[in-house]
Design a protein with these regions (language model features):
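Structural detector for helix-capping/boundary residues
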Residues: 50, 68, 103-104, 330, ...
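Conserved redox-cofactor binding core of oxidoreductases
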Residues: 1-85, 154-179
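FAD-dependent oxidoreductase catalytic-site/capping-region signature
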Residues: 1-28, 33-35, 160-163, 177-373, ...
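Stable alpha-helical elements in mature extracytoplasmic
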Residues: 5, 9, 47-51, 113, ...
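Soluble FAD-dependent oxygen oxidases
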Residues: 47, 64-67, 72, 85, ...
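Glycine-rich loop(s) and the adjacent beta-strand/alpha-helix scaffold that form part
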Residues: 72-179, 188
Length: 390
């Protein structure tokens, strides 16, 4: 599935000195082109389809629970005084049940869920745990700290003379056509990734490597979950790949049902605000290129009336949202790093029998999407688990 407006944006980016590329995984990701995606026969592909179903389904030693939530991990004191993770307490939807581990426990609840579970289990900043009446198993100040995310700044441009999803899905007939094409052919807008066209470039020429990533979409809306706009438009979503802002994930009570306090602290540093303003200027430069001229792009958000760095940084915060790449809250690190929760094999320092395998282990956010790096980390961890338990 290709869109004229996306092809024109790619050509405009090339005219603005962002080179064309057909492969973002060739070593240098700088350039503009169509993303490689996790998709097969019109369906999104995932780890369950690629790993669990062909390998684990039907095995007598594999059991998968859905609709369940870990309330806490269980620890026992060993004869030498160390603490070992021996299982988990799980809410299965009707009652709490205890699951015991004979070798080790692998926690993979993500960069938000894993620190929450660790803190509820007594592994985390001691003052936070005591505040909520939780016994301290391990004082680990790094648990829940160092939260990083890619903040996408969603610039919207009204256009004319090109089909967009806004127009195609604006009527019941249009929606029916889209649905019918997907049912019959597994193609069309319902088969596409949220963003098809991407680009990696620099916010300013003095940058050593690309520090911006674009996700360009043939649609627009006020916020995720809201209706599409009634006018034809595209969204040029740009994020700072290397943010310096750091946030946190901290429990608000000792109840597993209560969501933690998530403080991403977006745009909290001068550097991040500077890059935000620069990134919107890069977007404007691309939109002004000849390749897009015939579609008469009109900046709708943030609006051409905003020109100063201060205004652009402020407006960036108003039109931005997470791109769902939280990392870093259980980071791996060196032995002499007091904030390192995990060692180089993803084992939790200070206790035995427990690993964390998810994006929270990344000490610094990747310069691109986090999905594939997390899968690669999981594959490495699988090998380490086998080696360490021989």
């Amino acid at each position: 599935l290709r869109w004229d407006i996306l092809d024109a944006f790619a050509e405009a980016a090339a005219q603005a000195d962002v080179p064309h590329t057909t492969d973002f995984n060739r070593g240098s990701n700088e350039g503009v082109g169509y993303f490689q995606v996790n998709q097969k026969n019109g369906w999104r592909w995932n780890t369950a389809k690629a790993f669990l179903r062909p390998t684990c389904y039907g095995r007598p030693n594999f059991e998968l629970w859905t609709g369940a939530q870990v309330s806490r991990l269980l620890f026992e004191t060993q004869p030498d005084g160390t603490r070992r993770c021996t299982g988990a307490e799980v809410w299965n939807g009707s009652e709490k049940v205890t699951v015991r581990a004979t070798r080790e426990v692998v926690l993979s609840a993500g960069a938000i869920g894993s620190p929450q579970i660790l803190q509820l289990s007594g592994v985390g900043p001691s003052e936070l745990l005591r505040q909520h009446g939780i016994e301290v198993v391990l004082d680990a100040p790094g648990v829940g700290a160092n939260l990083q995310d890619h903040l996408q700044i969603r610039a919207v441009y009204k256009i004319a003379g090109a089909p967009t999803l806004n127009v195609m899905a604006s009527s019941m007939i249009g929606k029916a056509k889209i649905g019918l094409e997907y049912v019959l052919k597994r193609s069309g807008p319902m088969s596409m990734a949220p963003s098809q066209l991407g680009a990696f470039t620099r916010s300013s020429p003095d940058r050593e490597w690309p520090n911006l990533q674009y996700h360009v979409q043939p649609l627009s809306l006020d916020a995720f979950g809201d209706p599409l706009h009634s006018f034809p438009a595209f969204t040029a979503s740009v994020c700072n790949l290397n943010p310096t802002s750091r946030g946190s994930v901290r429990i608000r009570s000792n109840r597993f049902e209560d969501a933690p306090a998530i403080a991403p602290n977006y745009l909290s540093t001068d550097e991040d605000r500077k890059v935000a303003a620069e990134s919107l200027r890069v977007t404007r430069r691309i939109a002004q290129q000849p390749a897009l001229a015939k579609y008469k792009p009109e900046e709708w958000k943030p609006g051409v009336q905003y020109q100063t760095d201060e205004d652009l940084a402020r407006l960036a915060g108003d039109i931005a949202t997470t791109i769902f790449h939280p990392v870093g809250t259980t980071k791996m690190g060196a032995d002499n790093d007091p904030a390192a929760v995990l060692d180089s094999r993803l084992r939790v320092r200070g206790v035995q029998g427990l690993r964390v395998v998810d994006a929270g282990a990344m000490p610094t956010i990747t310069s691109g999407n986090t999905n594939s790096p997390t899968l690669m980390m999981a594959e490495k961890a699988a090998g380490w688990i086998v080696e360490d338990n021989r």
